């Protein structure tokens, strides 16, 4: 694997949209006891369900620590799931894994962003994070993909959504947060995005979902469903803390054009809940200094927007909530050519994210 001194844009590469053909999806096995309750066992069962759901549509590779390899291999024993040993600090491969980029000549490379556990020592969720910092490079090494490294620039994959046609959507709450890249201006951050994603237009939503401990990742709030169309988490309850956030995002989207000059079509997705962890669920998490505390009084950032597009399928979370059926119907309407598969998302949510956060698609090579 070669680390390149250029940028994807300069070399004719771009980040494709999530609906582009994929070769596989990456996951990382959860085990961190100060984040996942009961030593991670319920979350591991949820990951098995998720991996098997994806494997119906395309191959899955699950990275796992040496200590958990035998356990994971036993539970994931089926033909379309590969288990590989990679040391890690936690399971959030959307944020720690590489952002894959492609060109028109059948090549796939990867961007290795800086990672500081969502804020480093200024609001970050755990320390140390050095094994997570190395994960993207190891994935690219395994896949024989050349690597672009953004030294000194922190970004998580969950903080961006692209349409593959020149536009990226993100949030000010995350990318302009002082605990990510305080040495860079908004314009400088946009320049990095343009160079490494090969986009021309950056759409800045003010905030993400209320109480999202990643500082408002866009993938839990608003996502592309096709060029010019997005799905936005929504509530009509003016007493909900998300009300102002949803309406502010809608104002931006309604008054913005994408890189192709299109107005946005915005589909609304109801927000489940409000959802909270139980005292029993919180008690199952080890309390460790420097790690995110779990508290039953703190609202969980549950969202149906946190789904994954795979080849021919939509893998989405359910929450045993009255809005589950409506969420399924909305996804089926928006993606008529995909099979919508909903799996229980509560155990994933208890750890601080959901399906999209815990997966990373690898696009297929394209020759034009």
Curated annotation (Swiss-Prot):
The active site is at residue 357. Pfam families: PAD_porph. It catalyses: agmatine + H2O = N-carbamoylputrescine + NH4(+). The keyword Hydrolase applies. Its EC number is 3.5.3.12. It is an enzyme of class 3 (hydrolase). One of its GO terms (biological process) is putrescine biosynthetic process from arginine. Keywords: Hydrolase, Polyamine biosynthesis. The keyword Ribonucleoprotein does not apply. Pathway: Amine and polyamine biosynthesis; putrescine biosynthesis via agmatine pathway; N-carbamoylputrescine from agmatine: step 1/1. GO terms for molecular function: agmatine deiminase activity; protein-arginine deiminase activity. SUPFAM superfamilies: Pentein. This is Agmatine deiminase. It comes from Pseudomonas putida (strain ATCC 47054 / DSM 6125 / CFBP 8728 / NCIMB 11950 / KT2440). The lineage of its organism: Bacteria, Pseudomonadati, Pseudomonadota, Gammaproteobacteria, Pseudomonadales. The gene is aguA.
